[in-house]
Amino acid sequence: MKTAIFTVVLALAVFAVLSFGWEANGKALSEEFTELIHEKEAASETEARECRYFWGECHDHMPCCDWLVCRYKWPITYNICVWNRTFPEK
């Protein structure tokens, strides 16, 4: 009887140690993941867009990219950048 109780207590202790290790590992992974996301957001914010992309609003002071042209499209009340049927050269 004492051996069975000792085995159960020992098994519970092992499970407690293992679950604590998994929880700590999970927290570390989530912290690394959030840091990676913040780094990606910061990198994308530093890139300045010099031209407007497809369906972006355009004016004289906001030009479209090279492969797009600024046009007025009927249901929309402002000019948008549309494809000029060319491809950008790489």
Curated annotation (Swiss-Prot):
Entry's localization field: Secreted
Protein name: U7-theraphotoxin-Hhn1a 3
Keyword Signal: yes
Residue ranges the record assigns to the propeptide: 27-50
Disulfide-bonded cysteines: C51-C65, C58-C70, C64-C81
GO CC terms of this entry: extracellular region
InterPro entries cross-referenced by the UniProt entry: Huwentoxin-1
Similarity comment text for this entry: Belongs to the neurotoxin 10 (Hwtx-1) family. 13 (Hntx-13) subfamily.
Tissue specificity remark: Expressed by the venom gland.
Pfam families linked to this entry: Toxin_12
Domain-level remarks: The presence of a 'disulfide through disulfide knot' structurally defines this protein as a knottin.
Chain's role: Ion channel inhibitor.
Key words of the record: Disulfide bond, Ion channel impairing toxin, Knottin, Secreted, Signal, Toxin
SUPFAM superfamilies listed in its UniProt record: omega toxin-like (SSF57059)
Superkingdom per UniProt: Eukaryota
One MF annotation (Gene Ontology) recorded for this entry: toxin activity
Range of residues in the leader sequence: 1-26
